[in-house]
A protein has these predicted regions:
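Surface-exposed short loop/turn segments
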Residues: 68-73, 78-128, 138-148
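A structural signal for short, well-ordered beta-strand segments
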Residues: 42, 86, 113-117, 133, ...
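Short secondary-structure transition/capping segments
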Residues: 2-5, 116-130, 162-170
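Sec-dependent bacterial lipoprotein signal peptides
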Residues: 1-22
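A general structural signal for short secondary-structure boundary/capping elements
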Residues: 87-92, 130-135, 159-167
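Soluble non-cytosolic domains of exported or imported proteins
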Residues: 49-60, 106, 110, 146-159
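A structural "domain/chain start" motif
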Residues: 21-64, 71, 76, 123, ...
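Generic marker of residues within folded, mature protein domains
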Residues: 12, 19, 32, 76, ...
């Protein structure tokens, strides 16, 4: 059966449109600065806020997320290819919802942890990533603010750790 030229042209046009949609898709890690499999050493994060206990929670969460993600190797003992450090610059809380019968009493609030992430090659000191990330979580205020913030800290650190490892693996968009 011989097809008319118009239907053949329409077929090729449709095929070209479908194939061009995949042209920008990339397989694997997209960050050329840090290749997969490199060993990342997590250094201490500096806490520039008055909120205590942030450094330990953030460091532990980033180490755990690096192991879970498995794109990079977690270096221990100073043998890493890349040194990851950071500076926790802000800890903010803002009201999200209030008690139904008392508009002055907060029921839920959002906590934000703003951190400047710095990844540098250990051998040369060349900065690979210098980026500000914000971890967020929402917390229901139960009895008192201090216990609610203690419960929110692991969630906040985990959100920041997920964003940090995604930045290392996928690069800046």
């Amino acid at each position: 059966m011989i097809r008319p030229p118009a239907s053949r042209s329409a077929f090729f046009l449709a095929a070209a449109v479908m194939v061009s949609g995949c042209a920008s898709y990339r397989l694997g890690p997209v960050n050329p600065a840090i290749s997969a499999g490199q060993a990342i050493e997590v250094g201490l994060f500096q806490n520039a806020t008055p909120q205590p206990g942030l450094t330990e929670s953030v460091n532990a969460s980033i180490r755990r997320e690096l192991q879970r993600d498995a794109t990079f190797e977690l270096a221990t003992g100073g043998d890493g290819d890349v040194l990851l450090t950071g500076n926790i610059t802000a800890y903010r809380r803002s009201a999200v919802s209030f008690q139904p019968r008392d508009i002055l009493s907060v029921r839920d609030f959002e906590v934000e942890l703003v951190t400047r992430i710095l990844a540098a090659e250990k051998a040369t000191g060349k900065v690979l990533i210098d980026h500000e990330l914000t971890g967020r979580t929402t917390v229901r205020l139960g009895g008192d603010l201090a216990s609610a913030e203690r419960q929110a800290l692991p969630l906040l650190a985990n959100d920041l750790a997920r964003k940090t490892v995604a930045l290392l693996a996928e690069g800046e968009w």
